[in-house]
Amino acid sequence: MNRIMIVDLVNDLRNKNLEAEEYIERTYEKIGKYDKYINAFITIRSKEEVLKEVKESINKGGKLAGVLIAIKDNISTEGIRTTCASKMLEDYIPPYDATVIEKLKKEGAVIIGKTNMDEFAMGSTTETSYFGPTRNPWDLERTPGGSSGGSGAALAAGYVELALGSDTGGSIRAPAAYNAIFGLKPSYGTVSRFGLVAYANSLEQIGPMARNAEDLGLLFSIIAGPDERDATTINLNLNFELKERSVKNVRIGVLSDILEMSEKPVSGVIKDVVNKLSSEGALIEDTKLGNAEYALPAYYIIAMSEASSNLARYDGVRYGYSKYMEGNWREVYAKNRGEAFGMEVKRRILLGSFILSAGYYEEFYLKALKVRNLIKKNLDELFKKYDILLSPTMPILPPKIGEVINDPVRMYAMDLNTVIANLAAIPALSMPVGFYSDLPIGLQLMGKYLSDIYLINISSFIERNITKLYNLTASVKI
């Protein structure tokens, strides 16, 4: 366990306490040794090109000068392949950078590569990728969570200190929990989605992933902020400042209805953390979300409906996979899409189209929107009583590769604890709090809208004073 932070790394590179060549050589050596087993990256940039950019960045300066960062492969990067882990976009190279990438480059970050993910971010285990599954560095027989599993695994393996993911229903927080790292699903509208390949617009956010709370906050403050190219962003200054917050008198509601639905090894670790928070002076109460059992079906109805609409643009003609160009447009459309989309993506498109069809729109979609509003109202009431809501991030330990991929209902149920924050547009953070049989367990902290930085500071207190778990690197057993 190492206390070095990004600010220390930037200073070491600038002062030549760490030479750029050594930094790059060490990183690529580790990737070369382990990633044939982990499969965290879809695309890795050449060592020479990255070293050149790192040196230039160190000379220019910036909050992230010379720091390598891994980017989830559904975020547009100019000149770097962006596949969404799909055959449909296997060779797509964007002509522009996403807003978050522009902001990172401005502060000197250097992209090392694009990370593996569930195809079009549809999945909870990073097994639906066209490029093969990503494996968990803590146990190569198990999944790293999804859909941002490649970013989580790259951090856990120690390839990089920072990564970006996207979170539609838990896709940052699940890999954070399963890889013993920190991940934040920001408040909706705090981070621009311009350049994010859309899955479900009303639910998803780009967010930071890091190996400790301080770095998480720094990365969030860099990517957050308004963007005229994304009308959903809000005009708000979210500069992060690490504050040694105590949890004394912090009102914490433990979501007992969610906690009790978790596996015993998971709930046991979480209850131990809750007891320690209480001994530090936190005001702990058991509470219930109310209507929690409806959150998951409402989420999937909304997400699949938006997915079927968003993915209609991949017609096999304008861009993307276009092997079949003869016959009428229906044949071209069906053949190209049928061959280029994976099974899980097809399933969600079909279900979404069904939900939005005549006769079912009111029965399913409109009712799901009503449930969404009900959950928002329930949370508004809870946040009048509590500063933070606490639960396990994931209800189960990391499943083995192949264990849930062919059981969609079981895979969807993995998102039980995380979809709530997406439905309500509130921030939610996952942090490592313990292990069971050497498998990481994550704690989820949810706060009221725009309390992102408050959550990060609370997580910093917990990591420093209670769990002492930060900057963890898995000992990869190959």
UniProtKB/Swiss-Prot annotation:
Family matches, as InterPro entries: Amidase, Amidase_CS, Amidase_dom, AS_sf, GatA
Reaction equations catalysed: L-glutamyl-tRNA(Gln) + L-glutamine + ATP + H2O = L-glutaminyl-tRNA(Gln) + L-glutamate + ADP + phosphate + H(+)
GO cellular component: glutamyl-tRNA(Gln) amidotransferase complex
Keywords: ATP-binding, Ligase, Nucleotide-binding, Protein biosynthesis
Signal sequence residues: none
The protein's Enzyme Commission number: 6.3.5.7
EC class: ligase
Catalytic residues (positions): K72 (charge relay system), S147 (charge relay system), S171 (acyl-ester intermediate)
Keyword Phosphoprotein attached: no
Any one Pfam family match given in the protein's UniProt record, by short name: Amidase
UniProt-recorded Gene Ontology molecular function terms: ATP binding; glutaminyl-tRNA synthase (glutamine-hydrolyzing) activity
Superkingdom of origin organism: Archaea
Keyword hit for Protein biosynthesis: yes
Gene Ontology biological process: translation
Family label: Belongs to the amidase family. GatA subfamily.
Free-text function comment from the UniProt entry: Allows the formation of correctly charged Gln-tRNA(Gln) through the transamidation of misacylated Glu-tRNA(Gln) in organisms which lack glutaminyl-tRNA synthetase. The reaction takes place in the presence of glutamine and ATP through an activated gamma-phospho-Glu-tRNA(Gln).
Subunit structure: Heterotrimer of A, B and C subunits.
Protein name: Glutamyl-tRNA(Gln) amidotransferase subunit A
